[in-house]
Amino acid sequence: MTIHTRIEGMAAPLPVSNLDTDQIMPKQFLRRIDKAGLAEGLLYDMRFGPDGKPRPEFVLNRPEYAAARILVAGPNFGCGSSREHAVWGLMQYGIQAVIAPSFGEIFYSNAMNNSLMLVALAEADVGTILADVSAPENSWITIDVASMTVRSKSLTASFSLSERHRRMFLEGLDMIGATLAMQDQIHAFAARHWQQRPWLKDIASMTKNRLA
């Protein structure tokens, strides 16, 4: 995974409350056997009309927001079903971070584990940032992962990350990498465990041999 000490770029306003994962990635795009091509389905019913033509008024279809890499959204972003495709679609589209007052719990976990940064701020602070980025010339946002601060034209605010998620971004670790980084502690725990409970050691292999 990529190391992220800072995420910055143009932000697009998406002030929609309770935007669920079914809207972020509609069901017809879940039929693929791999992750490829999910950018096409991102927010499909918002980006395109019933005739399949782009809706020119939708923010991500506006030329001035074509380079957007950050979304500033309403509360409860990513609620609904647990489809991880919503995260993959956002990332394939080029979105690197979402700022909102709150997120769906499962979506938050999926996003952070896939290196999509989610920043939860007070609703008033998100409102200030939304006002900024509603003018394309004021839409540059900087998210400093190390200091856990976000900066727009009118606001600098702090946000919280768990130490595990912060480390994953700063060191470019996925879940497997984060686990492997704790190998010494895992081996030490295992050694203590087997010393205290020797009758459990290799119980799986002994059971297998007995049943063979």
From Swiss-Prot:
Q: What is its EC number?
A: 4.2.1.33
Spell out the Gene3D superfamilies in the cross-references.
Aconitase, domain 4
Cite the InterPro entries for this sequence. 3-IsopropMal_deHydase_ssu, Aconitase/3IPM_dehydase_swvl, AconitaseA/IPMdHydase_ssu_swvl, IPMI_Swivel, LeuD
Which Pfam families does the protein's record reference?
Aconitase_C
Transmembrane stretches in the record are none
- Give the pathway annotation: Amino-acid biosynthesis; L-leucine biosynthesis; L-leucine from 3-methyl-2-oxobutanoate: step 2/4
Q: Does the keyword Amino-acid biosynthesis apply?
A: yes
SUPFAM superfamilies, alphabetically? LeuD/IlvD-like (SSF52016)
**Under the GO molecular function aspect, what terms does this record hold?**
3-isopropylmalate dehydratase activity
Q: Which residues form a coiled coil?
A: none
Record GO biological process: L-leucine biosynthetic process
Q: Give the reaction(s) catalysed.
A: (2R,3S)-3-isopropylmalate = (2S)-2-isopropylmalate
Any GO CC annotation of this UniProt entry: 3-isopropylmalate dehydratase complex
Keywords associated with the record: Amino-acid biosynthesis, Branched-chain amino acid biosynthesis, Leucine biosynthesis, Lyase
Could you give the subunit structure recorded for this chain?
Heterodimer of LeuC and LeuD.
Function noted in UniProt: Catalyzes the isomerization between 2-isopropylmalate and 3-isopropylmalate, via the formation of 2-isopropylmaleate.
Which family, according to UniProt? Belongs to the LeuD family. LeuD type 1 subfamily.
According to UniProt, the name of this protein is 3-isopropylmalate dehydratase small subunit 1
**Quick one: which gene encodes this?**
leuD1
